[in-house]
Amino acid sequence: MSSNRKGDRRERELVNALDEAGFAVMRAPASGSATTRELPDVLAGNGEVFYAIEAKASSGRPIYLSGEEVEALVYFSRNFGAKARIAVRFDREDWYFFHPGDLYVTDGGNYRVKKETALAEGEDFESFTGGPTQTKLGGD
């Protein structure tokens, strides 16, 4: 399966999960391809909080986002009145969410999320959607 098809499938999976959690949610049409404007992959809100989400998936290798991709997400979010979030999912794991400012920035100005970082530091789905919070081992 091509990475684009897999990414599209993962985006739809995230949209369905957010819908089941009570959010009004939509996948931005042609995000990243058929428009000159940079759009987030997913818009979601529950009447109290609104998110513009860039969704990325990987089999286990680190996930990279370009600096421009993250800057465009932050810009859109500010203008739209939403909170910018990066959603990452690794095979056989759940979704984890990050504020763009919490991501590791490479020397080249790109952003990176490793699987172990997502599992240790990412906000889990239940916490993100207002459910029970994740208990982290060794945390305060």
From Swiss-Prot:
In this UniProt entry, which residues are annotated as the site Transition state stabilizer?
56
Recorded phenotype for the gene knockout or disruption: No alteration in sensitivity to UV light, slow growth on mitomycin C. No effect on homologous recombination; double hef/hjc deletion mutants cannot be constructed (synthetic lethality), suggesting the enzymes play overlapping roles.
- Binding residues annotated for Mg(2+), in chain numbering: 11, 41, 54
Cofactor(s) it depends on = Mg(2+)
Pfam families per UniProt = Hjc
EC no. given is: 3.1.21.10
Annotated active site: 31
**Can the keyword Protein transport be found in this entry's annotation?**
no
User: Does the record carry Metal-binding as a key word?
Assistant: yes
Cofactor binding notes: Binds 1 Mg(2+) ion per subunit.
Per its record, the protein catalyses:
Endonucleolytic cleavage at a junction such as a reciprocal single-stranded crossover between two homologous DNA duplexes (Holliday junction)
Subunit structure and binding partners: Homodimer.
Instruction: Specify the enzyme's EC class, one word.
Output: hydrolase
User: What role is this protein assigned?
Assistant: A structure-specific endonuclease that resolves Holliday junction (HJ) intermediates during genetic recombination. Cleaves 4-way DNA junctions introducing paired nicks in opposing strands, leaving a 5'-terminal phosphate and a 3'-terminal hydroxyl group that are subsequently ligated to produce recombinant products. Has a role that partially overlaps that of Hef endonuclease; double deletions cannot be constructed. In the presence of site-directed mutations that (probably) abolish Hef helicase or nuclease activity, a hjc deletion cannot be constructed.
Q: What is this protein called?
A: Crossover junction endodeoxyribonuclease Hjc
